[in-house]
């Protein structure tokens, strides 16, 4: 009986050791939203770390918990993943870690919106909506997204020390690219007489603060064809900016009155490449956002 017990214990230990070695060999990291996916893909480029988004390009952040509860969502990849990278501290609907942990108790959570290092430099600038709720769109700030990349890079380097040098190199490159996007906008708008806009959403507050754009908020539901002129006059601006489309007749009226209507990407809905989330979707989107802003600001300044 003792011999049988010893054999069983030996087999159990051997199995656990083999599973642990397999887990350590894996270099799979999971994300769920565009901004974080782009950050992690960029800072792990040319390494053997595998980065996956559990969602394709058709899942909006607005879906919240229902997206994770979807019976068709395949979370089997979490079983052998080493870590998830989320922003749960600022976005209450980020259930990535919770659902991944149900599949894998050993999985590590890296929250790109919060550093446990105690380094004040990595503390993100946070804003609230007018109703008091936290504004989760922290990645719309250039400064914040660089900090998010640093937070993720630090933790990934700890998990995969053999990749630390390439992560550091990629982090430098990514940070420089983000700074270039911001500086490109600032250089092109430096001599403009007015940087004032009418914001139809609070989701762009981080971006406007970073770029020193003076904005007055107007509820998009309160904008009508009849009051466009009055809103322009009241806010001393003809540039309307939102993160989603409004009625075509209102857009036509804005343009008829010599104004501009812009839709900027907050990455609520991911960008697509071959049906999947675009690894460079965030960078592409921010470049396009800056191009739209520059064009609108310059055209209004000439009038």
Where in this protein do the model-derived segments appear?
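Sec-dependent N-terminal signal peptides
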Residues: 4-13
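Extracytoplasmic metal-acquisition and chelation regions
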Residues: 17-303
